[in-house]
Curated annotation (Swiss-Prot):
Keywords: Acetylation, Cytoplasm, DNA-binding, Endonuclease, Hydrolase, Nuclease, Nucleus, Phosphoprotein, RNA-binding. It comes from Pongo abelii. This is Translin. Residues 86-90 are annotated as: DNA/RNA binding. The lineage of its organism: Eukaryota, Metazoa, Chordata, Craniata, Vertebrata. One of its GO terms (biological process) is RNA metabolic process.
Length: 228
């Protein structure tokens, strides 16, 4: 084989891979659009009247996750299953955002942390790497950390809306998250940096709870939490 033939063959490989990446990008753009729609829907809970609409907003968000499933089903057909991590960078950020959105919906519904397995069901993915197109553990953890930041914001807006029990629930939940993450030996630099932000979320929520206590809402808040 001549030198020119070698390079012609290599160009064929490069062109084929570029075609794959372009197909992936198209699907990822659709995923990003759907994620924005879900986020816009859920952001309404931060507004005064939004607290009364939480069940309705969560139900509507779950309908949008049906579209997410369709896009992810399409995405996994665009590349060989064994090359998941070769192209993972293309959808990593939007997938972390979708994990956060799924976790936010579940928290608003039940005030619990969604499991990785439950997220895979919501998104229509596999929980195990051996099965191909799966939810990477680090992507799940990143999404959970985004949730913590969102909940710290929600604790502040809850007080503005007159919901004084919610910040205490959020405080308990975020402190449990912090304890859980302390059990992990995080190697991923990006994940570790994001985890560093969790302590600020914890502090922010604690300040909200403390402010409620100073203002005399502590007994009322505690009683409301016990009732729930």
């Amino acid at each position: 084989m001549s030198v020119s033939e070698i390079f012609v063959e290599l160009q064929g490989f490069l062109a084929a891979e570029q075609d794959i990446r372009e197909e992936i990008r198209k699907v990822v753009q659709s995923l990003e659009q759907t994620a924005r729609e879900i986020l816009t829907l859920l952001q309404g809970v931060h507004q005064g009247a939004g607290f009364q609409d939480i069940p309705k907003r969560c139900l509507k968000a779950r309908e949008h996750f049906g579209t997410v499933k369709t896009h992810l089903t399409s995405l996994k057909t665009k590349f060989p299953a064994e090359q998941y991590y070769r192209f993972h960078e293309h959808w990593r950020f939007v997938l972390q955002r979708l994990v956060f959105l799924a976790a936010f919906v579940v928290y608003l519904e039940t005030e619990t942390l969604v499991t990785r397995e439950a997220v895979t069901e919501i998104l229509g993915m596999e929980p195990d790497r051996e099965k191909g197109f799966h939810l990477d553990v680090e992507d799940y953890l990143s999404g959970v950390l985004i949730l913590a930041s969102e909940l710290s914001r929600l604790s502040v807006n809850s007080v503005t809306a007159g919901d004084y029990s919610r910040p205490l629930h959020i405080s308990t939940f975020i402190n449990e998250l912090d304890s859980g993450f302390r059990l992990l030996n995080l190697k991923n630099d990006s994940l570790r940096k994001r985890y560093d932000g969790l302590k600020y979320d914890v502090k922010k929520v604690e300040e909200v709870v403390y402010d409620l206590s100073i203002r005399g809402f502590n007994k009322e808040t505690a009683a409301a939490c016990v009732e729930k």
